[in-house]
Amino acid sequence: MSEHIVNVTDASFEQDVLKADGPVLVDYWAEWCGPCKMIAPVLDEVARDYQGKLKVCKLNIDENQDTPPKYGVRGIPTLMLFKDGNVEATKVGALSKSQLAAFLDANI
């Protein structure tokens, strides 16, 4: 994983995501999820490309089972963009880099 991506947990979610300055993209994922593995390199690139404009976080749903239901996560990968502690936009499924960039550019 990229040094530009922060692993968050149920315990750190409030501090790392909800209280963050600026927009935060959260990737809800699991080790066994094929599409989650496909999107991982795309997230690494986006984390580098948007450094300073966007914080990118990953939350493993198997290890952190309290947070996903609070935000209605039903399928993975789910990408949620948070601003000022609120969900601004959500995408479910693996996206290409251009699809993810378009999603981010429209919402940050």
UniProtKB/Swiss-Prot annotation:
Transmembrane segments: none annotated. Keywords: Disulfide bond, Electron transport, Redox-active center, Transport. One of its GO terms (cellular component) is cytoplasm. One of its GO terms (molecular function) is protein-disulfide reductase activity. InterPro entries: Thioredoxin (IPR005746), Thioredoxin-like_sf (IPR036249), Thioredoxin_CS (IPR017937), Thioredoxin_domain (IPR013766). Residues 2-108 form the Thioredoxin domain. Belongs to the thioredoxin family. PANTHER family: GEO12009P1 (PTHR45663:SF11). Participates in various redox reactions through the reversible oxidation of its active center dithiol to a disulfide and catalyzes dithiol-disulfide exchange reactions. This is Thioredoxin. It comes from Pseudomonas aeruginosa (strain ATCC 15692 / DSM 22644 / CIP 104116 / JCM 14847 / LMG 12228 / 1C / PRS 101 / PAO1).
